[in-house]
Amino acid sequence: MDVENGEGQVQVHLKTKQEHYAVPDVPYAIDGTVTTVELNTFVNALLRQKDGSSDTDFDFLVFDEYLRGRLCDHLREKAISFEDAIEIEYVERFPAPEPQDCLLHDDWVSAVKASGKWILSGCYDNTLNLWTNKGKHILTISGHTAPIKAVDWISLDEETGRFVSTSQDQTAMLWQWNVGSNSVECVSVCKGHERGVDSVSVSPDGLRFATGSWDTMLKVWSAEQEDAAEGSSKRMKESGVRTPKITLQGHRESVSAVQWMDASTLLTGSWDHTLKVWDLSLEGIKTEISTNKSIFDASYSKLNRLILTASADKNLRLYDPRTNQGSVVRNTYLGHNAWVQTVMWSTTEEFLFVSGAYDNQNKLWDCRSPKAPLYDLLGHGEKVLDIDWSNPKYIVSGGVDNTVRVFKSRKALAEDTEAK
């Protein structure tokens, strides 16, 4: 029999890290043409024999990559001998996120960030908006004089929310929101960039934030409440103007992405085709990774310590900043049909991330499945500009169709099930 063409059987061991789904650890002979459909049927039959459990949907990993076709084709692509016993790992399938809300705005939504019960959005009409994660509009905030480009929360409790916004007006603004009275004030205007400010990220301790700009500069600022222009003129202090604590030069084009990797390390991505890792204690570049496309967004995972990029093509790419081979791409993810504008790792699920693109689509991915996303998250009628998964319960995105789309993730779906 020609096993390599799918005829005949392959010896496999079925493994799982989810012990309640474990089956006997013995070799099984299965047909080489099996797909996830037949493997699901087989594993569920074994589980019913073991304890009478009801059917569960599983995904299957063969040599650390999701099986997306026939087993024989997967093994051939990996150059694995068909005569060896093959280990197949199975995991409970992550449920499809469900659409919850469509939040209507007056202009393009270019920035979104969720925290607790709230969603903060920024628009091309120069305004910020606050919403509940159930879709109720709370407040419209004016202050910037050009389109908003990025937002981030500094701190949030039952009484007070603090956040930062950046704009094409060359400033960042610090805001304080009194939750009880639903009133907001601009605490400080942060001046120092000479072009629009494209990206922002607040430090893990909430004491600093970093901005990236079209002027190619990376700047670090104080986010503390009593710090307006420390060391600056009395006039600047009284007006609430802040100046940067640190300015770092190294990129040659717009700094389109910035994120704190830890308390003293920053990641940036740029239109100059590079990722840079900055050591703030030395105020210099620690690592540089060259890519072959302009970077629109980048995301670092504290769970797996890997970096994802969204670029000026249809692909997402995975990099390991710890490797000495800085330009080597760990994986490329194919699925979007236009430029990918935005990407973000899950903060709680080690292998999962979301992306949004100019093909009007969001996608949910597992980094072990490069050939296809887990799910398409449909709803936007125009280009997606920003996506956020800061709140593990909700995937939130904004776009050119003047909407924020809210999708329930597994944690919210589980709560709904428990409530019924």
Curated annotation (Swiss-Prot):
Its main location: nucleus. Keywords: Nucleus, Repeat, Ribosome biogenesis, rRNA processing, WD repeat. WD repeats lie at residues 104-142, 143-185, 192-231, 250-288, 290-329, 335-375, 379-417. The keyword Nucleus applies. GO terms for molecular function: ribonucleoprotein complex binding. It is found in: Nucleus, Nucleolus; Nucleus, Nucleoplasm. One of its GO terms (cellular component) is preribosome, large subunit precursor. It holds the Pfam family NLE. One of its GO terms (biological process) is maturation of LSU-rRNA from tricistronic rRNA transcript (SSU-rRNA, 5.8S rRNA, LSU-rRNA). InterPro entries: G-protein_beta_WD-40_rep, NLE, WD40/YVTN_repeat-like_dom_sf, WD40_repeat_CS, WD40_repeat_dom_sf, WD40_rpt, WDR12/Ytm1. Residues 10-92 are annotated as: Ubiquitin-like (UBL) domain. The keyword Ribosomal protein does not apply. Belongs to the WD repeat WDR12/YTM1 family. Required for maturation of ribosomal RNAs and formation of the large ribosomal subunit. This is Ribosome biogenesis protein WDR12 homolog. It comes from Drosophila erecta.
